[in-house]
Swiss-Prot record:
Designated name of the protein: Zinc finger SWIM domain-containing protein 1
GO MF annotations, alphabetized: zinc ion binding
Pfam families (alphabetical): SWIM, ZSWIM1-3_C, ZSWIM1-3_helical, ZSWIM1-3_RNaseH-like
Zinc finger SWIM-type: from-to: 363-405
GO cellular component, one term: nucleus
Keywords: Metal-binding, Zinc, Zinc-finger
InterPro entries to which the protein is assigned, alphabetical: Zinc_finger_SWIM, Znf_SWIM, ZSWIM1-3_helical, ZSWIM1-3_RNaseH-like, ZSWIM1/3_C
Superkingdom, natural source: Eukaryota
Residues forming coiled coils: none
């Protein structure tokens, strides 16, 4: 590893970066030892430019493996830039390829460059972009650069990439709005409505759907807070043209994949004050998940054959054995309908990638979606909708069992779902869809919701809501038939 580093770091290469105005001292043995754990194993030596201070902290860091350069050479048209801050305030810039031609699986398979600038000022960022361009002659083919809403150095991008168009990314706008919804401390039904509408719109970003979301924000957000959301972004058609080509399924997969990618970057770099340790942890993760290279080759073969690749790596035999035991325990312990619901959740677990972080009492389970809290102590519970609605083991609880090599136990679910204790539910859950029953359930649910709203309000608010409801009922069904409220 050390020899491979020394070879490419010649005097000629040092002069090349000196011509760029970048100071690079010869790499000392101590610095080489420090960086030894930072480099991804590759058949060819990677390109690395770094600068350390007296405390051995990384002042600047620019890294690209030959594999990453190869990915960029194939897909240079659209660059996606994501920033990750650590506790010291240092920022990791991750460059990823994007666009219709990119069909790569693997959470970091699209990453083509890592950089830590000395400072996020004009000089530091200009230097970072210049090194990226020096590493990648294909930079001239970059047509679009996608950034987050807080990305301020836009003039530097315009100067370094004069022919590229800089746009806000749909993913970063979505994350920005999600964070704002939580910060506003809205009523739970309103917050849930906004989050659901946002997710649906991002997966089908037509002009009509974006306009509906814009109107919904205008109606639900307090006027004084509305400017903070920059809802006018939803009406900027140029932003969404860069994303609209994806189908609903492709959009959902795209957002889920980026969600996990950014989570990985935050987990390894964003949680440690040492840039060196953060990058070492990130690169170790990439080494352990080196199947991304095979997926890259498969993606190229698929594109050359003009057919999408649907190759899915086989699960290890041990994992298959554990999941078969979980299936058996579900069938043995649960009622038929409950087992069917949980087996559907397990199917999602089997086809997904999960990140599991352990805590003292709770575990964070993420399956290519929002993070949920799992309470493993019986009866097991989770913060997701499935578990809250049915009180059954959800995909997150099943992922926890799979990771722990455990099976479902009777005390992990309520008694009403235990086999032999809920026969009255079989006819309902196993029945076919009925329009009459569907309407009845909808009316019942609506009646309960209205009743809850009328009960939990002041007398004045009750009178106002009741009179509004009375007017609606009379105008809809009356006036010849009195509606009993």
């Amino acid at each position: 590893m050390l020899e491979r580093l020394k070879a490419p770091w010649s005097a000629a290469l040092q002069r090349k970066y000196f011509d760029l105005g970048i100071w690079t001292a010869p790499i000392s043995p101590m610095a080489l030892t420090m960086l030894n754990g930072l480099l991804i194993k590759d058949s060819s030596p990677p390109m690395l430019l770094h600068q350390v201070n007296k405390t051995a902290q990384l002042d600047t860091f620019n890294y690209q493996s030959c594999f990453m350069q190869s990915v960029f050479d194939h897909f240079p048209e659209i660059l996606f830039i994501h920033r990750t801050y650590n506790p010291r305030g240092k920022v990791l810039y991750t460059f990823l390829v994007d666009g219709p031609r990119v069909q790569l699986e693997g959470h970091l398979a699209r990453a083509v460059y890592f950089a830590i600038p000395a400072k996020e000022d004009t000089e530091g960022l200009a230097q970072m972009f210049q090194v990226f361009k020096k590493f990648n002659p294909a930079w001239e083919r970059v047509c679009t650069i996608l950034v987050d809403p807080h990305f301020l150095p836009l003039p530097i991008l315009a100067m370094e990439f004069p022919t590229a168009e800089v746009l806000l990314s749909a993913f970063h706008i979505c994350k920005f709005l999600q964070a704002k919804f939580y910060q506003l401390s809205l009523e739970r039904p309103v917050e849930r409505l906004l989050l659901t509408s946002l997710q649906s719109t991002m997966c089908s970003a037509t002009a009509g759907n974006l306009r509906k979301l814009y109107t919904l924000l205008s109606n639900c957000i307090p006027p004084a807070k509305l400017p903070e959301l920059h809802s006018h972004w939803l009406l900027n058609d140029r932003i969404w043209l860069a994303h609209r080509w994806r189908s609903r399924a492709e959009s959902s997969h795209y957002f889920q994949s980026l969600e996990v990618t950014t989570h990985i970057l935050s987990q390894f770099f964003g949680t440690t004050p040492s840039e060196k340790q953060g990058m070492a942890s990130l690169f170790r993760y990439m080494q352990q998940n080196s199947a991304d290279k095979a997926n890259f080759n498969q993606g190229l073969c698929a594109q050359n054959n003009h057919a999408p690749s649907d190759t899915i790596p086989e699960s290890p035999k041990l994992e298959q054995l554990v999941e078969s035991h979980i299936q058996h325990s579900l069938n043995a312990i649960c009622t038929g309908p409950a087992a069917q619901l949980c087996l559907g959740e397990l199917a999602v677990v089997q086809k997904s990638t999960h990140l599991i972080g352990s805590g003292s009492e709770k575990m964070n389970i993420q399956i290519l979606e929002d993070t949920h809290k799992v309470q493993p102590q019986p009866p097991a519970s989770c913060s997701c909708y499935f578990n809250q609605a049915f009180h059954l083991p959800c995909r997150h609880i099943l992922a926890m069992l799979s990771a722990r090599r455990q099976v479902l136990q009777p005390d992990m679910l309520p008694a009403q779902w235990t086999a032999g204790c809920a026969t009255s539910l079989d006819s309902i859950l196993g029945s076919k869809w009925s329009e009459t029953l569907d309407k009845h359930l909808a009316v019942t649910h609506l009646t309960e919701e209205v009743g809850q709203l009328l009960q939990h309000c002041t007398k004045e608010e009750f009178e106002r809501r009741y009179s509004t409801l009375r007017e609606l009922a009379d105008s809809w069904i009356g006036p010849y038939e009195q509606v009993q409220l």
